[in-house]
Amino acid sequence: MSNITKKSLIAAGILTALIAASAATAADVPAGVQLADKQTLVRNNGSEVQSLDPHKIEGVPESNVSRDLFEGLLISDVEGHPSPGVAEKWENKDFKVWTFHLRENAKWSDGTPVTAHDFVYSWQRLADPNTASPYASYLQYGHIANIDDIIAGKKPATDLGVKALDDHTFEVTLSEPVPYFYKLLVHPSVSPVPKSAVEKFGDKWTQPANIVTNGAYKLKNWVVNERIVLERNPQYWDNAKTVINQVTYLPISSEVTDVNRYRSGEIDMTYNNMPIELFQKLKKEIPNEVRVDPYLCTYYYEINNQKAPFNDVRVRTALKLALDRDIIVNKVKNQGDLPAYSYTPPYTDGAKLVEPEWFKWSQQKRNEEAKKLLAEAGFTADKPLTFDLLYNTSDLHKKLAIAVASIWKKNLGVNVNLENQEWKTFLDTRHQGTFDVARAGWCADYNEPTSFLNTMLSDSSNNTAHYKSPAFDKLIADTLKVADDTQRSELYAKAEQQLDKDSAIVPVYYYVNARLVKPWVGGYTGKDPLDNIYVKNLYIIKH
């Protein structure tokens, strides 16, 4: 939205969010395209999901499935813009009180209506410490009234600033104005969950026989570590525009296996990590099937800021400086990613970042400064720094970890032991803080700097670097005290500078989204930098 439009609406006291003239996106099949008789899609999802409960998930694999099973107030269109989901329209007063008008024909897969009461229950459940959601802090990012006290256990979840004005009107009250609040509502964690099923079946409510969904698809079959199969939900409000009848998600963690099964015809769409050793070959052999698109993600190494010796900023800074990003990006990976100097990608909406001075240095100068800092911290050739580098099971992450360990050894003289864990164990280890340095990646939940920066707040449930900085926390809090976009961007830049000063993480590269897509998969655009793919927008062309 332009500043002119925004200012005029602020003057009126009400901002009506960007709403498409038509209903939310669905499969748009061009005239003349012949559809296949069999409308089924097979996607690789990168790993076994952590859960199918929207309040128990935090990774990309889980979000991919959740988008098809559950629909929140808003969804993304094919270019990544927030669009109507269960809410067909909404407005706000001074960016602080937001009112969402729900579709009267929105239903659960059991035929019961989706109501504002479902959202009240679901958001209270997400906030409740007893749920132990890894995304409880997401409601803090939206500054919903009373969320801080609820997470701290000082108030009950029922005090959350949400209410049902009637069955189809949902009101959210924030503790302070948040102009971009509506952007947060695309994320799966704020989708509704079915109260009756949750209360009846407890932790088993997501099993195929028990689950009730409100998205375009429902769960047909789930064989752990083998496949998740979804089928069309005939109760979905926009089911008439859905084309694909069944989608299968495979938990293949090996990028090479992913490509091999794609080329054998078993998979229609690979995961968004391409094998390093096959990428250039694939570009030559099947160029029309190799998709390389923008992706709002940062690949980095997460340092345990609370664990000695990594609680010494000199050690963290030495690791940051001595990593040769050009080798990683241009020689090891070579897929078009960009060397990173920050946590927030500089092309994020509202980001006006300043390159740090060290990023302008030669690698030789960075290495010299890194060795000096490490020596000051007490580590020398006779007493080298030795630590474990943790990564989740993946061909790509393993190759990068090997390369990074070698670079740090050469440039800094440190000894790195590599350790890998399966996805769910890996996430638990990081949350518990029982690691030295870990491979990490963050992909934006919405296109705004706080989608990255909020995760580094001292009290964030996403803060697995265990970084604590009152100065950083204050800068983020101050962003909500300014109405001017330019001033807000300046504060975001200062927050990034604080992260850099503290060397909270080791940024490696800003991602591109590289995957293989069969030519008969219609509706895939690759234009959404958040990579929010909804299978209801896709279709299979006759081939």
Curated annotation (Swiss-Prot):
One of its GO terms (cellular component) is outer membrane-bounded periplasmic space. The keyword Hydrolase does not apply. One of its GO terms (molecular function) is peptide transmembrane transporter activity. Keywords: Disulfide bond, Peptide transport, Periplasm, Protein transport, Signal, Transport. The keyword Thylakoid does not apply. It is found in: Periplasm. Its main location: periplasm. Disruption phenotype: Mutant cannot take up cell wall peptides. Disulfide bonds join 297-443. It comes from the Bacteria. Induction: Part of the opp operon, which is constitutively expressed. InterPro entries: Peptide/Ni-bd, SBP_5, SBP_5_CS, SBP_5_dom. Part of the ABC transporter complex OppABCDF involved in the uptake of oligopeptides, including the cell wall murein tripeptide L-alanyl-gamma-D-glutamyl-meso-diaminopimelate. Plays an important nutritional role and is involved in the recycling of cell wall peptides. Binds peptides containing from two to five amino acid residues regardless of their sequence. Also binds cell wall peptides, such as L-alanyl-gamma-D-glutamyl-meso-diaminopimelate. NCBIfam families: PRK15104.1. Belongs to the bacterial solute-binding protein 5 family. Isothermal titration calorimetric measurements of the binding of lysine-containing peptides of different lengths to OppA show that the dipeptide Lys-Lys is bound with 60-fold lower affinity than related tri- and tetrapeptides (Lys-Lys-Lys and Lys-Lys-Lys-Ala, respectively). Accommodates the ligand side chains in large hydrated pockets which impose little specificity on binding. Tight binding is achieved by utilising the hydrogen-bonding potential of the main chain of the ligand. This is Periplasmic oligopeptide-binding protein OppA.
